[in-house]
Amino acid sequence: RQEWQALKDFYRYGFPAVVQQCWAYIATATLLFIIGGAIGWWFSWQDDSFMTLVLGSDFVENVRSTQELWTVSILGVEPVASSSITINNIAVSLIAIIGGVTTYRPEISIITPPGAFTLYLLIFNGLMIGCVSALVAQLNLAYDLWAFIFPHGSLELPAIFFAGGAGLLL
């Protein structure tokens, strides 16, 4: 009983207090993602080669040739797809937090400044969303994309922004 009360108190008082104390970091993480998204959308809208560079030619050509989103491929295997999406988002969140401490890049044998990988992760994920948004807008598939993203993204994206804020704070 006491444990449940402590958990309830944390979510009622503790968590909101932490968010208020760290709001600038969370807002910065959110802004970095949005800036990445805006850059991705703008440059993809202007030049298809940018979109292909970020998303890969196979992905872009597949969506263009089928005139369908990859979301139709999860029909019938929703539990597996849901698990895969959840694992991906947990991994992104953990990397966003851990990336705030330091990042080792073996290909160049250096340790980057603290937070560098968190910055990269937030901007690049925004960039990918922006590029995909431009692609589906060009093909009149935007409704299908956002109908897929909004139900789970309304929880997942803020979680990633909180994790990114934590990474920037570290």
Roles of regions detected by a PLM:
Residues 30-44, 155:
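Hydrophobic alpha-helical membrane-insertion segments
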Residues 127-170:
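Hydrophobic alpha-helical transmembrane segments and adjacent short intramembrane/lumenal linkers
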Residues 54-61, 116-132:
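Small-residue-enriched core segments of transmembrane alpha-helices in multipass membrane transport
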Residues 41-66:
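Interfacial/capping segments of alpha-helical transmembrane domains
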Residues 1-8:
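Soluble N-terminal domains of membrane-associated systems
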Residues 75-117:
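Individual transmembrane alpha-helix segments
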Residues 66-84, 146-155:
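Short aromatic-rich membrane-water interface segments that cap or initiate transmembrane helices
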Residues 15-35:
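Alpha-helical transmembrane segments and their helix-start/interface "positive-inside/aromatic belt" motifs
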